């Protein structure tokens, strides 16, 4: 009888040990993953980038190379519009005087024009391109003309 009780106690001890060790592992192990991306405004002079993160999702260990495609409806459009309102990706700040076109000439601040403002300056049509007009014969080199650096300065101006 004593031997039978000893065998049963060993069996109970083994079962208890298995239950205690398995209780630390709860379910199938998973890893959490998240989509991350950077949204930038390439038209500005500075980088102006925002790092955005998607929601967390469970990634099974065998599926690390099988990341599911990001659904386009994860973020409502209102959230992105709120981000654009909070963090504008534009250099046009109302009331700052910078890039607002509130004046022209040297009296409107530092006189520094951004690249975009230089592209879109208003031109007075009455005197546009009339000062530097030359005939085609004068612009082309002739056989008798020396191509060295002799001549008038205006011949070398573009």
Swiss-Prot record:
Q: Where is this region: Disordered?
A: 134-158
Q: Where in the cell is it found?
A: Cytoplasmic granule; Cytolytic granule; Secreted, Extracellular space; Golgi apparatus
Alphabetic keyword roster: Apoptosis, Biomineralization, Disulfide bond, Glycoprotein, Golgi apparatus, Lysosome, Proteoglycan, Repeat, Secreted, Signal
Q: In what way is this protein post-translationally modified?
A: O-glycosylated; contains chondroitin sulfate and heparan sulfate.
- Residues with an annotated glycan are 94, 96, 100, 102, 104, 106, 108, 110
Q: Main location per UniProt? A: cytoplasm
GO process terms (BP): apoptotic process; biomineral tissue development; granzyme-mediated programmed cell death signaling pathway; maintenance of granzyme B location in T cell secretory granule; maintenance of protease location in mast cell secretory granule; mast cell secretory granule organization; negative regulation of bone mineralization; negative regulation of cytokine production
Q: Does the keyword Secreted apply?
A: yes
For this UniProt entry, which segments traverse the membrane?
A: none
Region of interest called 9 X 2 AA tandem repeats of [SF]-G, as start-end residue ranges on this chain = 94-111
User: Do you know what upregulates this one?
Assistant: By Epstein-Barr virus (EBV).
What family does the Swiss-Prot or TrEMBL record give for this protein?
A: Belongs to the serglycin family.
- The protein's name: Serglycin
């Amino acid at each position: 009888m004593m031997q039978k009780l000893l065998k049963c106690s060993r069996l109970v001890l083994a079962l208890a040990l298995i239950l205690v060790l398995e209780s630390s592992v709860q379910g199938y192990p998973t890893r959490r993953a998240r989509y991350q991306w950077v949204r930038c405004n390439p038209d500005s002079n500075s980088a102006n980038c925002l790092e955005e993160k998607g929601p967390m999702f469970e990634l099974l260990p065998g599926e690390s190379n099988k990341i599911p495609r990001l659904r386009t409806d994860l973020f409502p459009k209102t959230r992105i519009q709120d981000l654009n309102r909070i963090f504008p990706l534009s250099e046009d700040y109302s009331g700052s005087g910078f890039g607002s076109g509130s004046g022209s000439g040297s009296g409107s601040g530092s006189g520094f024009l951004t690249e975009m403002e230089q592209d879109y300056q208003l031109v007075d049509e009455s005197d546009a391109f009339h000062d530097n007009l030359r005939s085609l014969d004068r612009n082309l080199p002739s056989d008798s003309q020396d191509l060295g650096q002799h001549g008038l300065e205006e011949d070398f101006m573009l």
